[in-house]
A protein has these predicted regions:
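Active-site/acyl-donor-binding loops of N-acyltransferases
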Residues: 4-40, 104-238
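A short helix-loop-beta-strand connector motif used in the catalytic cores of GNAT acetyltransferases and
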Residues: 81-93, 207-211
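Short secondary-structure boundary micro-motifs
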Residues: 76-80, 144
Length: 238
């Protein structure tokens, strides 16, 4: 059960119900308020059917050390893309370098299933909003959500990259950010384990990072070890 870090009431309730907090996950969110320059070194296009095998190999290799990850086959990954509402292969992108796929990720519009908003805006966000309100008079600034305002965002899903080429993933993130702006979204976000190398790449785009706690309850035996932990973004919504 993921619980937002500031939600003390829920954490207290689940603690009383016998659940234990065993892991943190982070949700970095890039504010898509201005377009990024992209590198001509890479070819970035939607994935095509004949590339699925290579994409699956990259995803499986990238996530091989993460608990909770189940490797894909080409067939199960195609089914996965089709079965998640408002996802699909047309929203899955691959980065090619010298005809080799070196990074990939999908964009999922989960807003068709659920909306995110602050029922009570954190104090830090209120402070940032005041500061950015002044700065907005002289330059473009990231949008800060108001209390009760629905967040317009896209989830980054099923990402992976050749760890020898993190700049390929950065190029893809910039491309997805530009697409998000064209689609009039305010944020591009995902959910990751703190040890995920993807987080280090995403930090180069200066995201807002929030923390969620994973609470679990064992009905038999010891609590599971979730270190490092594969985060399926569908679990944050569905």
């Amino acid at each position: 059960m993921p619980i937002y870090e500031s939600n003390r009431a829920s954490k207290s309730l689940f603690g009383k119900l016998g659940y234990s907090r065993i892991r943190e996950i982070k949700t970095p969110a890039i504010s898509t308020y201005k377009k990024s320059d992209t590198s001509p070194e890479y070819s970035i296009k939607p994935v095509i059917k004949k590339e699925i095998v290579d994409v699956v190999g990259l995803i499986n290799e990238y996530n091989s050390g993460f608990i909770h990850f189940l490797p894909f086959t080409a067939q199960t990954f195609e089914t996965h893309l089709k079965s998640v509402p408002w996802y699909g292969s047309e929203n899955f992108w691959a980065v090619r370098n010298e005809n080799k796929i070196v990074a990939c990720a999908g964009l999922w519009d989960s807003s068709k299933l659920a909306n995110l908003y602050y029922a009570r805006e954190p104090a830090a966000m209120k402070m940032m909003k005041s500061i950015f309100g002044v700065l907005s008079l002289i330059t473009k600034v990231p949008k800060i959500m108001a209390e009760g305002e629905r967040l317009k965002f896209l989830y980054i899903a099923d990402y992976a990259f050749d760890k020898r080429q993190p700049e390929a993933m950065l190029a893809l993130l910039k491309h997805l950010s530009n697409l998000s702006i064209d689609m009039k979204q305010d944020y591009l976000m995902t959910a990751t384990d703190p040890e995920d190398d993807f987080l280090a790449v995403m930090k180069k785009l200066k995201p807002q990072i929030e923390i969620w706690s994973i609470f679990v309850k064992s009905f038999e035996g010891d609590l599971p070890t979730l270190n490092p932990f594969y985060v399926d973004v569908r679990d944050m919504i569905l």
